[in-house]
Swiss-Prot record:
Belongs to the HesB/IscA family. Its cofactor is iron-sulfur cluster. Homodimer. This is Iron-sulfur cluster insertion protein ErpA. The keyword rRNA-binding does not apply. InterPro entries: FeS_biogenesis, FeS_cluster_insertion, FeS_cluster_insertion_CS, FeS_cluster_insertion_RrpA, HesB-like_dom_sf. GO terms for biological process: iron-sulfur cluster assembly. NCBIfam families: iron-sulfur cluster assembly accessory protein (TIGR00049), PRK13623.1 (NF010147). Keywords: Iron, Iron-sulfur, Metal-binding. Iron-sulfur cluster binds at C41, C105, C107.
Length: 113
C-alpha cells in the first residue's frame, strides 16, 4: 500500500466556498491560489486569489471537484498547514492554520517563522 502524505489540508468548508464563488464564473478552470508574500506586521502574509493557470512546480489539491494551488516557494512555509473558510461575528474569510508560524499578528493575516 502506498500512503502519500498531502502537505496541506484543503478543508471541506474552504472547498465548498470556492465552489460557490466560481459557479457563476465563465471559467471552469478557476482554482484558489494561496501564496506567501513579504509584508504585514509579522514579516510574511498570506494571499488568496483565483487563478486558471497551474505553473510548473505548483502543487494542486482537489476537494469537491475544485482545486487549491500553491507555488513551490510558498509551499515550503505552508507544509503541514490547513486552508479553511470561517464565518463568524468578525466576518467571513479564508484562513491558513500554519504550524510553522512562530507568531502571528492580531488579525491572523501575517506571521513570522
Amino acid at each position: 500500500m502506498n500512503d502519500i502524505q498531502i502537505p496541506i489540508i484543503f478543508t471541506d468548508a474552504a472547498a465548498k466556498k470556492v465552489k460557490s464563488l466560481i459557479e457563476g464564473e465563465d471559467n471552469p478552470n478557476l482554482r484558489l491560489r494561496v501564496y506567501i508574500t513579504g509584508g504585514g506586521c509579522s514579516g510574511f502574509q498570506y494571499g488568496f486569489t483565483f487563478d486558471d493557470q497551474v505553473n510548473d512546480g505548483d502543487l494542486t489539491i482537489e476537494n469537491q471537484n475544485v482545486g487549491l494551488v500553491v507555488d513551490p516557494m510558498s509551499l515550503q512555509y505552508l507544509i503541514g498547514g490547513t486552508v479553511d473558510y470561517t464565518e463568524g461575528l468578525d466576518g467571513s474569510r479564508f484562513v491558513v492554520n500554519n504550524p510553522n508560524a512562530t507568531s502571528t499578528c492580531g488579525c491572523g493575516s501575517s506571521f513570522s517563522i
